[in-house]
Amino acid sequence: MSEPEVTYSTVRLHKSSGLQRLVSHEEIQGPGEAGYRKCSVPWQLTVRSLGIFCFLLLVTVAVLAVKIFQYSQHKQEIHETLNHNHNCSNMQSDIKLKEEMLRNKSIDCSPGEELLESLNREQNRWYSETKTDLDSSQDTGTGVKHWFCYGTKCFYFIMSKNTWSGCKQTCQHYSLPLVKIEDEDELKFLQFQVISDSYWIGLSYDKKKKQWAWIDNGPSKLDMKTRKMNFKPGGCIFLSKTRLEDTNCNNSYFCICGKKLDHFPG
């Protein structure tokens, strides 16, 4: 018996062109590139999500910054308003305090004003009495040109020239002494009042005491000034608009009589 013959044949399958291109393309790209391509879509979504989140975060931060700034401004305005109200309150307190001080000062000044009014009434009364004596004088050629008061003293200008002794007698006739100048201020005041002429005052040289003496033999705050003037012994002092000067007592000048009030009215 003979063995059966075995016939071998080769089967070749022809791939389609599309499938061949796909296979060849995958073979060319390799496995890494294919995986990257598969993952590229989720990565883009992540980036976009992060971008949107960052934008929203920036917007939120900006809104918060604006709110914080507005809160800070509002807080500052409230603080300034409170300070202004506090300052106004302090000013009102100061005004009330000053008003109270003014009221107290007005109360304190009331006795002084009453004293001044009483003093003026006393001066006017004294002048009225003295003026009556002067007006009733029978002497001719003698009169008062003007008079005025300074402090508690009144002055009378006798516009009739006479010697120092004659002026002394004229003033005494009206119950007035020759004027005694109490201090520097009174001297300046009298010099401001006098016209361009010379007037006897109540200062002369006392030959017995060998010193200058006022008509009442009392002291004066003007003594220091008169000592510095180095008046010559033996004379009398006259007053002009610019100076005090010693001269012969027999010279003829106008007279200034003066008298203090007896007391401050109580």
From Swiss-Prot:
Residues 67-266 are extracellular. Homodimer; disulfide-linked. Keywords: Cell adhesion, Disulfide bond, Glycoprotein, Lectin, Membrane, Receptor, Signal-anchor, Transmembrane, Transmembrane helix. InterPro entries: C-type_lectin-like, C-type_lectin-like/link_sf, CTDL_fold, Ly49_N, Mouse_KLRs, NKR-like_CTLD. This is Killer cell lectin-like receptor 5. Its main location: membrane. Residues 143-261 form the C-type lectin domain. It comes from Mus musculus (Mouse).
